[in-house]
Each structure stands twice: as C-alpha cells, then as structure tokens.
C-alpha cells in the first residue's frame, strides 16, 4: 500500500525546518510521497507573500518524493482539513495518508472525529515546537477525538517568523533556508522593504528598469559564487539612488555633509553619484551595513580589496541584460560566471580603453582597483 504524507502550513517562507520534518517523516514512517500544501490567507493569518509567490518558493524544493499540492481551500474549520485530505485520497485511491503538522497546528484543531472517519487517514505525525507542552497538547487533542498520534521531536526548528526577521537584517541564514529559495527571495526582494516603490519618485523609468535588472543579475552572480545574496540585492537596488540628481545637487550634499573633498570625485557625476548614493541609502533608506554602503559607493570604479558584494554589484551594473552592447561585453559575461575578480578586471579595463580612446581622463581610483585585482589574480595564479 502506498504511504502518503500531507504537510499543511503557510510556508511564509518555506525553510529547512519544514524540509527536516518532511525527511524525518519519510524515513521513519516510510512515506513514498509527501505533499506540501500552502494555505491561502485566512482569518487566522495573513501571509506576507501571496499564495502564488509562496507556491513558487515551494517549487524550488520539490522532488520525486516531495510535491506541491495546489488548491485554494483555506484551513478555517475541521471540514476544510477533511476537504484537503480528500484531495489526496482522490489522487491516490487506497493509499494510507498521514497528515504532518507541528504541535501548534495540532492545538488549533477542535474536532478530530471527521478526520479519522476518512478511510485513508491512518495516523497524525506531529512535531514538537518550542513554547508548546507536547504532553498537554496531545492530551487536549485526545480529548477532542484524536488517536493514533505519532509524536516526533527534532533539534530546534526555526519558525517562518524567525526566518523573516533574519531576512530583514539581510542575513541569508543558509542553516535555515535552502540557497535556491534564498536566491529567489533576494532576486525578487521578497520580505525586504519595497525599494522599487521608494525609488519610483526619484528615478526615471529607464533607470528603474536598469536597477531592477542589476538586482537580478547581481543576485544571480552572488548565488553562483556563494556571496551574500540579500546584501547584494539591497545594494543593487540602491546603487543608483542618486543617479538622477543634478550634479550641483550632489555636490551640495557632498560638501554640506562632508562626504568627500576629492576634486576628481566632486567634478565627476559618474563618481559622485556613488558617494552621495551611499549617504542617501543610509539617511533615507536606513541602511547601516558596511558591505552594502561600500558596494553603492564604489560600484562605478571599484576600489582595492573589494568584497564579493561589491564585485557582484559592480559587474552587474556593467553586464545586466538591458545594457547596450559594447566591445568585450559577452566575454565579460562569460568570465563573470567563472570568476568575479577576473570579470571585474576585464570590465574595468574595457571601460579604461573606451575612455582613453575618446580622449577622456581615466580615474586614478579605477586604476587603483585594476592594480589591486591584477596583483591578487597574479598571486592566485602563482600559487596554483
């Protein structure tokens, strides 16, 4: 007889705690397949993300034995749970079905009689949760008609609320969230402030489109090279927050706030918008993280000892898909998939060649970044 598990929850977002419960249940109770059923909004809880977006995140975790069950039945009453269980029963005929839930979910079910009337339901697999007395909740459930409860305990399982709190602090928490899920979160800016709406009044439409494209490209690079994805996402979204200001307005802020006395920077909008942008990111958008602020400051010309976040944003700014084609662009894109430093060096050198070819003056700050990258790459090659 086929053995099927069904885990219901809001999955806002799905995390490794959910998957640990699924894998434990699969192993201990020999489940062939486990369905994950994301609940729609209800009077009980209004999820941060829409049902559609949460389903997409769950889709990053599906496999041959872990599947997404899609429906819009809210878990409002026990009848709703019976209806959801019936969906599984219809799909799998005479299979044995095991609802999987946390102690918190078990405590909220007030009548179990109808659940056990379903011939497919064999037992409840219930996982202990911090803040809930397993003994008391199980006794309460038994008083409401529950029986055949398989009680399991895993090491500390985070809540989705704890995961969202870490995301708000720009922490990828790889010990809590699968990297492919965090990649999707960072790429779309889920659970982060709505920077797109904040930037809309201060950026042109084309600049905003470029910014969103830079975020996607930068986060893709961070994911590929195991760099901090959330920090990269935020830095990419804010990297051009001062770009549409007039040169004189940027100069005034730089002087009034003592951001720089460097004549080269003050005279160049291309250099100045990064410096002023970092100030605005801090003063207007509440950014305090040094990696993010540095990535905004130096995204145009770089600097010695760039972090991976800085490299991802600098590169994404020059290779994102909306960028007009220029000599060497495709080669830099290919390099970026393999090595951030090599790609950044190629990008800065390409810019230098172009500026010199039209008789322009090349920034010594960019040259410092080139020299530093060349030195580091030479050392790496010598060690190899």
Region spans (language model):
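Divalent metal-dependent catalytic cores for phosphoryl transfer on phosphate-bearing substrates
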Residues: 199-202, 219, 223-345
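Internal alpha/beta core interface subdomains
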Residues: 345, 352-353
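A short, charge-rich alpha-helical start-of-domain segment used by transcription regulators
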Residues: 205-209
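Short amphipathic alpha-helical face segments that pack within enzyme cores
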Residues: 16, 20-21, 213-216, 276
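Charged phosphate-binding loop/patch that engages nucleotide di/tri-phosphates or the phosphate backbone
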Residues: 172-196, 353-384
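Nucleotidyltransferase catalytic core that binds NTPs
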Residues: 1-194, 282
